[in-house]
């Protein structure tokens, strides 16, 4: 599991940061990529990575401001040209279906794959299967905006083969039965319950990706105990009034959310073009004074989300 940042700027494309898009790489887990927001030029950014549009299975839109959605029609079209034929689902606020369908209709674009929509109006679980769950909650922005919490299911515990070998139980098909939790009767008459020889499950990972927002309790609940929190940091700590008026957050406000939620790392994005070079580093320092594991990410940064260490 990795996060790859395709655009980390705010408002409009800049020389050093494109507008918002974040890829959650789940290639090992399910051979898929999930995108969160698709700002203008996202497909150009993808060309500079190893990501393949045909691998994109889900797109989660936080809100319908242009710097988060203007790249959608082009990316959807290119996915057809590049061998994408598997269904793709777009999740987002009411209006995302109309935006996409209008752009495709007016441009005469025909997709080679089924396109589905799941429009959101309130906090809910938008997707869940045996391996992942995605839930959302509303944030505090000028228009309807949501944050997403991606939770990986726990990994089954490993079979404790060393304990079985200590009992003179040779490896073979019986190990597969025991790993499945079955009770097995051995040739010598002993009965072995597989459940007694399976280690505790390994906790799955949680990633929280927020849209544009002012401080809100929903940000904390979405991020609770997450392995990584992606939070906007449009302004520096001294611009609190400006951030409030424009429905955004400062570096220190984002860090306060991370601290309160008990996350493992805070990844700051949606950076105003005014913060370049040393000023960008200053944003990071501001956040680190509140929450030490803070990082201002740049376009094309790739962040590993490792499985928690086993106890």
Curated annotation (Swiss-Prot):
Q: Name one Pfam family in it.
A: Lactamase_B
Q: Which reaction does it catalyse?
A: Endonucleolytic cleavage of RNA, removing extra 3' nucleotides from tRNA precursor, generating 3' termini of tRNAs. A 3'-hydroxy group is left at the tRNA terminus and a 5'-phosphoryl group is left at the trailer molecule
List the molecular function annotations (GO) for this entry.
3'-tRNA processing endoribonuclease activity; zinc ion binding
Tell me yes or no: is rRNA processing among this UniProt entry's keywords: no
Report keywords, A-Z: Endonuclease, Hydrolase, Metal-binding, Nuclease, tRNA processing, Zinc
Q: CDD domains, from UniProt?
A: RNaseZ_ZiPD-like_MBL-fold
The note on the cofactor says: Binds 2 Zn(2+) ions.
The positions annotated for binding Zn(2+) 2 are 67-68, 212, 270
Judging by the UniProt lineage, the source's domain of life is Bacteria
Query: Which InterPro entries does the protein's record reference?
Result: Metallo-B-lactamas, RibonucZ/Hydroxyglut_hydro, RNase_Z/BN
Where would one find the signal peptide in this protein? none
Enzyme class, top EC level, equals: hydrolase
The EC number(s) attached to this protein equal: 3.1.26.11
Which residues does the annotation say bind Zn(2+) 1?
63, 65, 141, 212
Cofactors needed by this protein, per the record, are: Zn(2+)
Query: Where are the active-site residues found?
Result: 67
Subunit info?
Homodimer.
Family as reported in the entry's similarity comment = Belongs to the RNase Z family.
What is this protein for, i.e. what is its function? Zinc phosphodiesterase, which displays some tRNA 3'-processing endonuclease activity. Probably involved in tRNA maturation, by removing a 3'-trailer from precursor tRNA.
Name-wise, this protein is Ribonuclease Z
Organism name? Lactiplantibacillus plantarum (strain ATCC BAA-793 / NCIMB 8826 / WCFS1)
